[in-house]
Amino acid sequence: MVAFLQNRSWAIALAACVSLFQPLSAQKSADGSSPESHAVQVQMHNVMYHYADNIAVHIRRLAGELVPVKGDLPIFDDKNSFTLHVKVAEMAITPQAMANVLNQYVFARKDAPIKDVSIQIDKDRLKIKGKLHNKGDVSFEMESSLSVTPDGKIRLHAEKIKALHLPAKGFMDLFGIEIADLIKTGKVQGVTAEKDDLILDPAQALPPPHITGQVRRVRLEGNNIVQVFGEPEKYKWVNVPARNYMAYSGNLLKFGKLTMDHTDMVLIDPDPRDPFDFYLDHYRDQLVAGYTKTTPAFGL
C-alpha cells in the first residue's frame, strides 16, 4: 500500500514494497526469546525526528533496529514499547534543542542542581550558561570542548568556568561536592561526572523512544552538534529509491489497529527540498490526512 500523508505543510508517502528490502526470516514468538530476535530493521535518510515541539534531531543517515522493550513487537503508538538501537548513523542537534533536552528532561526535577540552561556554539567550543539552583540561582558560564569516551558517550571538558561571586577552578568548585556526588552517582538522568568533566549519555538524556548505540565521533559544524555512530562510510546501505525516507524491514510491527507481518514498509517524504519532518506523537494525524494504496504483495 502506498499512503500519501499530510500534516500542516508536510507531505509524506508511506510505501510497503517487497522489492525494496529482503525480508528477514520469520522469528516466531517463544518463551525465553530475546527482544533482539523480534527487532525490526530500520534505515533512515534526511529525517528531522521530533521528540517534542521544541526538540528535534536531524538524522542525516541511520541504520539500526527497533528493539521491543516488552512483548514481541514494537508498537508505533507506544514510544515506550521499543528502543532505537543504532548500528551506524550521523545525526545533528542544534544547541538550542540540546538545551531544551537538559531543561525539560535531564534537569527537570524541582530539586535539580542546574536550571535555565542555554547553549551556544562559539568557534570550537560550547558556551553553556545556567543557574546553580542549590546556590541561590547564581548564574554560571562554562566553555567546554567535546570528545567521545571509550564507551561511546559524549564528554564535555570545562576549559573555562565563571560563576558570580563563587571561586571556580573546575567542575567540583563550581557545583560543590554534594551536587557533584549527586550527578556522579547517576541520580541525574543522562549525565554523570568524571573528575572535572561532564559525561552525557544520549541514550538516557533524550526522551522516548530512547536511542542506544555508541558514539564514535562528535564535532561542531555550523549551528549543529554532530554525532557519528559506528562507521557509516563502511556500512552496506540498502538502496532505497528516495531521498528522504524511513524504511522498516522484518518481523512484526504494529501501528494503529494494523499489525504488519514480515514488515516491509517505507515512509517517504515526496518533497526532497528539506528534511522529512516526522513526529511520532502525531503520525496518526498525518495518516488520517493522507490516502493509501495496496501493493500486489498485500503490503501496507
Annotate each language-model stretch with its function.
Residues 27-300:
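Extracellular/lumenal and peripheral-membrane lipid-interaction modules
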Residues 12-20:
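Bacterial N-terminal signal peptides
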Residues 22-26:
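Sec/Tat signal peptide C-region and signal peptidase I cleavage site
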Residues 1-11:
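Bacterial N-terminal signal peptides that target proteins for export
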